Amino acid sequence: MSAPGGPLARLEARVTREWQRRGALAWALTPFACVFGLCAALRRTAYAQGWKQPVDVGVPVVVVGNVTVGGTGKTPTVIALVDALRAAGFTPGVVSRGYGANVKTPTAVTPASRASAAGDEPLLIARRTDAPVWVCPDRVAAAQALRAAHPDVDVIVSDDGLQHYRLARTVELVVFDHRLGGNGFLLPAGPLREPLSRHRDATLVNDPYSGALPPWPDTYALALTPGAAWHLDQPALRRPLSQFAHERVLAAAGIGAPERFFATLRAAGLAPTTRALPDHYAFADNPFVDDAVDAILITEKDAVKLGASWRDARLWVVPVEAALDPRLIALVVEKLRGRSPA
């Protein structure tokens, strides 16, 4: 893993910038994007035409994913959706790939799991929702194992996996942030895994800057709101973000879109020094030992990777809550009660 702010982090930042414009590099990579698009289209067509059959795992599946590379707010969306489905009378479970974990077979994730064995996002979901969570690169196998272990589960939420066509699904939700589709090019010329025109049941847009929604059908605003920060060593100790306004604060994030976290803190009245870490940064050691600050604010996704050996009293965790549009929840519930997986 590259050091914080090192070559890998700088490369990620440059690629992200290039993907927002149609510069010389993007145009030079378009032949490769065409090849990528052709391969992706062939995979989609194989399932759409019935040449390959998706696997029905026996209960409805809601896929929460994106068509772009990088963080868009999927994890807080999954957490909020699980809570909403439970409130609507369902018993939800969650499956995920377990990115960053050495997982080859279906594995249960509990609040006591380690991020290195479960993946940071699945572990966060397990801790926040207390729902059954299973991980495996093969999401079908994960869903089948989850159902075998928890026969009361009557709906499965797939954290990402939009392009995992083998898993039959009832509802597809696509999440965007303010960058939307960037320059509109497919990988590697742009950030798109699939064309923006890809079918989905609903689109969620998290734009903390303008709040504007694109003119797409069935599009809903996704609001991500920070809560009171809690102390890493003493989770019961909480402070409103406003209390950090007059302190020397470092904000650090090893997520797909760290600038969104920093913007959230600025909107709360803070003026932190910022440090973007590589996505899924492992925190093998403490990268903050030389920082002369009063407080270090990190994301929940990063916090699950910090074990009991971390003893930096400056570390505070900023939780984020996703507010789902009631109309979106009603749409999902209606589809779950009225349709079978396909």
Curated annotation (Swiss-Prot):
Domain of life: Bacteria
E.C. code: 2.7.1.130
One Pfam assignment: LpxK
GO cellular component: plasma membrane
The keyword Kinase is assigned to this record: yes
Residues that hold ATP according to the record: 68-75
Family: Belongs to the LpxK family.
Entries under NCBIfam families matching the protein: lpxK
Protein's UniProt name: Tetraacyldisaccharide 4'-kinase
Organism encoding this protein: Burkholderia ambifaria (strain ATCC BAA-244 / DSM 16087 / CCUG 44356 / LMG 19182 / AMMD) (Burkholderia cepacia (strain AMMD))
Lineage: Bacteria, Pseudomonadati, Pseudomonadota, Betaproteobacteria, Burkholderiales
Gene, per the UniProt record: lpxK
